């Protein structure tokens, strides 16, 4: 059964952190706008934003070695690390503003201070990390980072990683107390609760069937209620597709030229989760290692303290898996259905180029539990098999697209796609994703609300005082803002 059209100003597809962030920003900047949200599942934040479906790292390049590139001459390029840290500073400022204005309460339910650390083994890697720290510390954003090779100091930071270590190879650790663990699922739920109180219509168990633009310029979005089987067509001036792995198939339905020659490659993740509370309580850090030579960036191993509903947990991974699904709750036909006449060459080109990724995935799929435990023991030498269980994390769909230089290039970041007229936007890709949600949504607003954005800037600077500045170039502003963030988010 189909009901009549329903008109709205904004439609947000997907009940994750991206839609929650964009909806919250729009309600602050243009409260008169009528906003509707459609989510396929029964509650918000259950796919990529779910606490067990992502690493929960507040990505700020304090520990992630893949954000700093080493040159042949031994110098380290930290520009990407600084950019990602700046983006996360924007997220923290916005969350602090929402706490300050009473729109978010109990920040400890979604963010915790957890030190971020890097861990390397071997002379070459130790030399790299020393150069990395020396370069990063030139920026105020990394002023508190410490580097150590002293056994006692390292043991005071992460005893489980030092006890039982027998190798003669040199190791080094960095330590930054300003790191965080974020439960993006809990944050998403809080943001949507606040939006509902402000009159935003959030509908669950809703499957978006089609998105088509009319000659009048408005978008028609056909939505099926999964409980009643009724189909409703909604008219909207603006549509945002923030549906995680489902964003690509939905973008393809729009028919905009930006949806052509673009594909997606799904990668699933497995983690080892500790079941021994005594072990869990002895580790308090997010420790990132260095990806093996030839391995993709998403393979960086890390030993992670997590907080879920106030309880401490410990994870190690990721180990890559493969499923053709684009969502954890998706269909095994997702990958096949995403192949279109306009992107088949793009997809095949990527397949030929990315043989190393294919080889890596095959090797990961062949791992036994004992082999996974051996990988863990590189970090935690005394780890016992009986203290760990395997869990399946979320699906990530890596973007494949053509560039000016060549076809079929695999992208490892987060990508915003917008229509020429700015009436539709979609978010594709993976890490750093959720951590940079606020900055990414500012980009969406700038590209899609060009005429209104200038008038919004005073309010934006009230919410995010560093907007328009690079904090790395403004030490006094950084310290002033950091005091406010620390006060309201209760982090370091």
UniProtKB/Swiss-Prot annotation:
InterPro entries: FAD/NAD-bd_sf, MQO
Disulphide bridges: none
Uppermost EC category: oxidoreductase
Record keyword Oxidoreductase present: yes
Catalysed transformations (reactions): (S)-malate + a quinone = a quinol + oxaloacetate
GO molecular function terms listed in the Swiss-Prot or TrEMBL record: 2-hydroxyglutarate dehydrogenase activity; L-malate dehydrogenase (quinone) activity
Single GO BP term: tricarboxylic acid cycle
Gene3D superfamilies associated with the record: D-Amino Acid Oxidase, subunit A, domain 2, FAD/NAD(P)-binding domain
Cofactor dependence: FAD
Transmembrane spans: none
Pathway membership, UniProt: Carbohydrate metabolism; tricarboxylic acid cycle; oxaloacetate from (S)-malate (quinone route): step 1/1
UniProt keywords, alphabetically: FAD, Flavoprotein, Oxidoreductase, Tricarboxylic acid cycle
Keyword RNA-binding found: no
Pfam families, per database record: Mqo (PF06039)
EC number, as in UniProt: 1.1.5.4
Similarity comment text for this entry: Belongs to the MQO family.
Protein name (Swiss-Prot/TrEMBL): Probable malate:quinone oxidoreductase 1
């Amino acid at each position: 059964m189909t009901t009549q059209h329903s008109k709205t100003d904004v439609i947000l597809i997907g009940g994750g952190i991206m839609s929650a962030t964009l909806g919250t920003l729009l309600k602050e900047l243009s409260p008169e706008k009528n906003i509707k949200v459609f989510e396929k599942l029964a509650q918000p934040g259950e796919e990529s934003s779910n606490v067990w479906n992502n690493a929960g790292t507040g990505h700020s390049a304090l520990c992630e070695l893949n954000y700093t590139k080493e040159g042949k001459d031994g110098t380290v390029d930290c520009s990407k690390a600084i950019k990602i840290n700046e983006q996360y500073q924007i997220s923290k400022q916005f969350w602090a503003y929402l706490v300050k204005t009473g729109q978010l309460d109990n920040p400890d339910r979604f963010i915790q201070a957890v030190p971020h650390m890097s861990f390397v083994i071997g002379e070459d890697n130790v030399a790299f990390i020393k150069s990395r720290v020396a370069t990063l510390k030139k920026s105020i954003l990394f002023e508190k980072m410490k580097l150590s090779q002293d056994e006692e100091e390292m043991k005071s930071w992460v005893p489980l990683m030092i006890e039982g270590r027998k190798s003669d190879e040199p190791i080094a650790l960095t330590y930054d107390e300003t790191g965080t663990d974020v439960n993006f699922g809990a944050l998403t739920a809080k943001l949507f609760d606040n939006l509902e109180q402000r009159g935003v219509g959030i509908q669950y168990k809703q499957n978006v069937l089609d998105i088509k633009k009319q000659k009048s310029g408005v978008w028609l979005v056909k939505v099926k209620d999964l409980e009643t089987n009724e189909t409703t067509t909604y008219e909207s001036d603006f549509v945002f597709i923030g549906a995680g792995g489902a964003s690509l198939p939905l973008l393809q339905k729009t028919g905009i030229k930006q949806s052509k020659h673009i594909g997606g490659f799904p990668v699933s993740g497995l983690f080892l989760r500790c079941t021994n509370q005594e072990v869990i309580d002895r580790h308090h850090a997010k420790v990132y290692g260095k990806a093996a030579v030839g391995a993709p960036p998403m393979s960086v191993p890390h030993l992670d303290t997590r907080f879920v509903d106030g309880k401490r947990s410990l994870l190690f991974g990721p180990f890559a898996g493969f499923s053709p699904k684009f969502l954890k709750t998706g269909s095994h036909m997702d990958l096949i259905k995403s192949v279109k006449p306009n992107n088949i060459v793009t997809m095949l080109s990527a397949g030929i180029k990315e043989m190393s990724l294919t080889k890596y995935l095959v090797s990961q799929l062949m791992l036994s539990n004992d082999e996974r435990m051996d990988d863990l023991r590189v970090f935690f030498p005394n780890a016992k098999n009986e203290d760990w269980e395997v869990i399946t994390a979320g699906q990530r769909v890596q973007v494949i697209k053509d560039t000016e230089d060549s076809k079929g290039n695999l992208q490892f970041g987060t990508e915003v796609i917008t229509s020429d007229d700015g009436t539709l936007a979609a978010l594709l890709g993976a890490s750093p994703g959720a951590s940079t949600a606020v900055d990414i949504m500012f980009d969406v607003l700038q590209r899609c609300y060009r005429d209104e954005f200038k008038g919004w800037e005073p309010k934006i600077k009230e919410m995010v005082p560093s907007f328009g500045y690079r904090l790395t170039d403004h030490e006094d502003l950084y310290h002033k803002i950091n005091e406010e963030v620390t006060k309201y988010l209760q982090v370091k």
